[in-house]
Swiss-Prot record:
A divalent metal cation binds at D178, H180, D267. The gene is Hdac8. Binds 1 divalent metal cation per subunit. It comes from Mus musculus (Mouse). This is Histone deacetylase 8. Interacts with CBFA2T3. Interacts with phosphorylated SMG5/EST1B; this interaction protects SMG5 from ubiquitin-mediated degradation. Associates with alpha-SMA (smooth muscle alpha-actin).
Length: 377
């Protein structure tokens, strides 16, 4: 794998905080869409002995009060009710977005409270100065609305993390590199100039969630504080990094953030069943390094990623980037070793799909964003 030139957290000696406990991983494993993914990610990080270089922090479970800093009481109470009863056919569930892609399975409330608690715990570690980087790979569920589940997301832990960070940090930058538009986070902060949201995502007719065109820039006091970068299928590392760096350079200068929340969904990676972007962890790693060189308090979250082995490869590689470690190409023997066949290596090779992103169109988008950011004061 490409070598991080120096520890990405150089300049401060505090090790990153890594949110983990066996109980936490076990409950995160229960999400129907990504079964056992949390275990696969943690096991690979452990197989490379990266956990030994981080401060492992056991997450608290989010209280009803903490979750209600964003979500409505009515939604949380309904989620708790159907979770206890395992009632998938409750008549009120549809209005709360429960069903189809967010089934109201038994125990789903406990899952949501665990994830929310993981991200809040990570944010609190940053507030308390225990670290400069805090990692919750099981977080990053960016589609949930205040009163509605959406897109496999029952609780918007990213919003809860940002709200917690706002207790200390005046201006927070949210950067979303998932394949899908970070609509729930953008909506939550669309009227404020204290949180800037930046999302690079696939934007195409019929592709979920259907929002996030470049003309979506925020509302009221928050106008120009939402930045959307619509991207087409087939994009690879070099072009993606060029876009990401160009946008973040302008955003940083205009907004001057005091803390960063970075959502690193791995559904952009070649081999994902979404079959859209054609990225590798190296490209995402370069974007991550670009953010880390600001040396701000940084909260790292996961997100999508439906090829489970590739998601574990990606987030393990990115953990190595944060630590400034080069990882051996050969996957070490561990519990899930057989999932990494037939080659058993950490690298992911892009597929042969065409890149649908025309250079002139990309330049148009970048110019448009640069123009909008002139309004940010």
């Amino acid at each position: 794998m490409e070598m991080p030139e120096e520890p990405a957290n150089s300049g401060h000696s505090l090790p990153p905080v890594y949110i983990y406990s066996p109980e936490y991983v076990s409950i995160c494993d229960s999400l129907v869409k990504v079964p056992k993914r949390a275990s696969m990610v943690h096991s690979l990080i452990e197989a490379y002995a990266l956990h030994k270089q981080m401060r492992i922090v056991k997450p608290k479970v989010a209280s009803m009060e903490e979750m209600a800093t964003f979500h409505t009481d009515a939604y949380l109470q309904h989620l708790q009710k159907v979770s206890q009863e395992g009632d998938e056919d409750h008549p009120d569930s549809i209005e709360y977005g429960l069903g189809y892609d967010c089934p109201a399975t038994e125990g789903i409330f406990d899952y949501a409270a665990a994830i929310g608690g993981g991200t809040i715990t990570a944010a609190q570690c940053l507030i308390d100065g225990k670290c400069k980087v805090a990692i919750n790979w099981s977080g990053g569920w960016h589609h949930a609305k205040k009163d509605e589940a959406s897109g496999f997301c029952y609780l918007n832990d990213a919003v809860l993390g940002i709200l917690r960070l706002r207790r200390k940090f005046d201006r927070i930058l949210y950067v979303d590199l998932d394949l899908h538009h970070g609509d729930g986070v953008e909506d939550a902060f669309s009227f404020t100039s204290k949180v800037m949201t930046v999302s690079l995502h696939k934007f195409s007719p019929g592709f979920f969630p259907g929002t996030g065109d470049m003309s979506d820039v925020g509302l009221g006091k928050g106008r120009y504080y939402s930045v959307n970068v619509p991207i087409q299928d087939g994009i690879q590392d070099e072009k993606y990094y060029h876009i990401c760096e160009s946008v973040l350079k302008e955003v940083y200068q205009a907004f001057n953030p005091k803390a960063v929340v970075l959502q690193l969904g791995a559904d952009t990676i070649a081999g994902d069943p979404m079959c859209s972007f054609n990225m590798t962890p190296v490209g995402i790693g370069k974007c991550l390094k670009y953010v880390l060189q600001w040396q701000l308090a940084t909260l790292i979250l996961g997100g999508g990623g439906y090829n489970l082995a590739n998601t574990a490869r990606c987030w393990t590689y990115l953990t190595g980037v944060i630590l400034g470690k080069t990882l051996s190409s050969e996957i070490p023997d561990h519990e899930f070793f057989t999932a990494y066949g037939p080659d058993y290596v950490l690298e992911i090779t892009p597929s042969c799909r065409p890149d649908r992103n025309e250079p002139h169109r990309i330049q148009q988008i970048l110019n448009y964003i640069k123009g909008n950011l002139k309004h940010v004061v």
